[in-house]
A protein has these predicted regions:
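A conserved short coil-to-beta-strand element within the FAD-binding core of flavoproteins
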Residues: 10-15, 102-113
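N-terminal glycine-rich dinucleotide-binding loop that anchors FAD/FMN and/or NAD(P) in oxidoreductases
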Residues: 19-20, 24, 80-107, 177-179
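Rossmann-like dinucleotide/flavin-binding elements
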Residues: 3, 8-24, 29-80, 116-179
Length: 179
């Protein structure tokens, strides 16, 4: 081939804290694809759009849900959420009684749940499952190995830079037009 287009996507980011190998830890992709998590208490780490939508889904399924967000407010990092959507999502989280723990960081996953640190110090939050929604990391690709082969190599979508479906489509379109 004269050119190779790599669209390898991204993987959920796993924070470097103790307990990530626990069977109670689930990434957001697994959670959003309809994973039935046994138990009642779900702790979602990350208050961006993916974390909030995941939390809302489990709350609507009858689970008791807490969001732990390191920043002072949810929906304040990552891809900007239009204000009307953010307002509606905040209202739905309140209506479904999702607990928000902002300004808190995950310190450890334990048999009881998770240890978080925040303005009031350290606290253990009981949880049957901990869902990680702290972002995505571009998946490694063959771009480096293909360099110097004489082929044109293009990376598109989340494989080059994590974004939205719109940015993925735009990057693929740009490459397709160039070819």
């Amino acid at each position: 081939p004269d050119a190779v287009v790599l669209a390898v996507g991204a993987t959920p980011t796993v924070p470097p804290v103790a307990g990530m190998d626990s069977p109670k830890v689930v990434d957001c992709v697994t959670a959003l694809t309809g994973a039935d998590l046994p138990g009642q208490r779900i702790l979602v780490v990350g208050g961006g759009l993916v974390g909030c939508e995941t939390a809302l889904g489990y709350a609507q399924a009858g689970k008791t849900v807490t969001i732990v967000e390191a920043l002072p407010d949810i929906l304040s990092a990552g891809i900007p959420v239009p204000e009307m959507n953010a307002s509606m999502l905040r209202d739905l989280l309140a209506e479904w009684k999702v607990t928000l723990r902002t300004g808190c960081r995950l310190a450890q996953v334990t048999a009881e749940g998770a240890v978080v640190t925040g303005p009031q110090g350290e606290a253990t939050l009981p949880a049957d499952h901990v869902v990680l929604a702290v972002g995505f990391t571009p998946r490694p690709s063959l771009a480096g190995e293909l360099a110097g082969t004489g082929m044109e190599v293009y990376q598109v979508g989340d494989g080059s830079k994590v974004g939205s479906v719109m940015t993925a489509i735009a990057s693929a379109y740009t490459v397709a037009r160039a070819l």
